[in-house]
Amino acid sequence: MKGLFVDTAGWLACADIADPAHVKAAAARDTWLQEGGLLVTTDYVADETLTLLRVRLGLATAEEWWQLVDSSPRLRWEYVSLARSDKARAFFFRYRDKEFSFTDCTSFVIMRELKLQEVLTTDHHFTQAGFLTLPK
């Protein structure tokens, strides 16, 4: 099954109807799922997403999002282990000319490990790291 990584910016764009990328992001996610694909995300991305949803859209929206993703059979959870964290830290400090967040670096490590090329996000850092972003 083909996997699409979902970054915090992708989750936010899908959840927030006021987000400029909402329509395209939700359509890209829905098309991916309709074509039999699997969504992939991490515990670090979920941490960021829950926090930002609560701040921007309220606790009820954050809770609704959590219930939706937590029960989804089409979502694969990946966790940032100590080994993955060590690799992410090395990546974080290697690219001094980029403003990658540490969470982004953990995502890059996991995406490379799982051989995922596509990511649902509006964050340009994924393009800088060599991944293909959706929506286009």
Which residue stretches match the model-derived regions?
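Active-site neighborhoods of divalent-metal-dependent phosphate/nucleic-acid chemistry enzymes
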Residues: L75-E118
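Short acidic, glycine/proline-enriched helix-loop-strand junctions
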Residues: V69-S81, Y95-D97, F126-K136
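Alpha-helix boundary recognition
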Residues: L33-Q34, R54, Q67-S71, F93, ...
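Short, well-structured N-terminal submotif of metal-dependent ribonuclease cores
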Residues: M1-T41, R54-L68, P135-K136
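Short secondary-structure boundary segments
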Residues: D43-Y44, D104, D123-H124
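Acidic, PIN/NYN-like endoribonuclease modules and their adjacent C-terminal/linker elements
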Residues: F108-K136
